[in-house]
Design a protein with these regions (language model features):
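Molybdopterin (Moco) oxidoreductase catalytic core of the xanthine/aldehyde oxidoreductase family
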Residues: 2-28, 81-120
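Glycine-rich and small/hydrophobic secondary-structure elements
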Residues: 2, 56-81, 104-127, 199
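Long, well-ordered alpha-helical segments
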Residues: 47, 72-77, 81-90, 198-209
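Helix-loop-helix junctions that connect adjacent transmembrane helices in secondary transporters/permeases
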Residues: 94-173, 193
């Protein structure tokens, strides 16, 4: 039940003309083929072709979902063929938290991650252990029930830098002025935690000011 290698041959239909970002979907996913797993050797070959169909121009989120879909479907197929429970086969091949930093079989080096813990938490919240009982009950009522499983990694950013300024006044209060801004991810909370950890300040004494050109 150990993953030894992954080989991918991908033919991508770009449509009749090359649009901006058209090759993102078939190429940006390459590093993501490693997923959260210890697959030591990964080979990927991508061929982009033109056709008489509409051109491809992805807007958001393209590339990474394709990689996760490929890997997780392969794992499910392997689990069925080998008779190994699908959570167990994933567990046997998941990168351990104490193995970080971890160089994957293709492109990326992970600096941190508790992938098995994440999977266990999701299984607990989904009451995975009792799923078969729920399935049988559903089938008895003439309906079908299924459950999916996938471990997904997301490329969060590129390697471009960003600035942050920290001002500390005479009272010991810190004002953090980051170059990036929060739009739903809770950056302000994260900034306070980081500054508190590095400078030894209480989080109540840290103020985060975002998108204010007057400062």
């Amino acid at each position: 039940g150990r993953f030894l290698a992954l080989e991918l041959s991908n033919i991508a239909n770009l449509g009749a003309y090359l649009m901006p970002g058209g090759i993102i979907s078939p190429t940006m996913h390459l590093g993501g083929l490693a997923g959260v797993y210890t697959t030591p050797a990964i080979y990927a070959e991508v061929s982009c072709v033109f056709s008489n169909t509409g051109s491809i121009g992805p807007y958001r989120g393209a590339g990474r979902p394709e990689a996760s879909y490929i890997v997780e479907r392969l794992i499910d197929n392997a689990a069925r063929e080998m008779g190994i429970e699908r959570a167990e086969i994933r567990r046997r091949n998941t990168i351990a938290a104490d193995a970080m930093p971890y160089q994957t079989g293709l492109v990326f080096t992970y600096d941190c991650g508790e992938f098995e813990k994440n999977m266990d938490m999701a299984m607990h919240l989904a009451d995975y252990g009792e799923f078969e009982a729920r399935r049988e009950d559903t089938q008895a009522r003439g309906k079908l029930r299924g459950i999916g499983m996938a471990n997904v990694t997301e490329q969060t950013s590129n390697n471009l830098g960003e600035t942050v300024e920290i001002r500390i006044d005479s009272t010991g209060t810190a004002t953090v002025i980051p170059g990036s801004s929060s739009h739903g991810q809770g950056h302000d909370t994260m900034y306070k935690i980081l500054v508190s950890d590095r400078l030894g300040l209480d989080e109540d004494d840290i103020r985060v000011t975002q998108v204010d050109t007057d400062v």
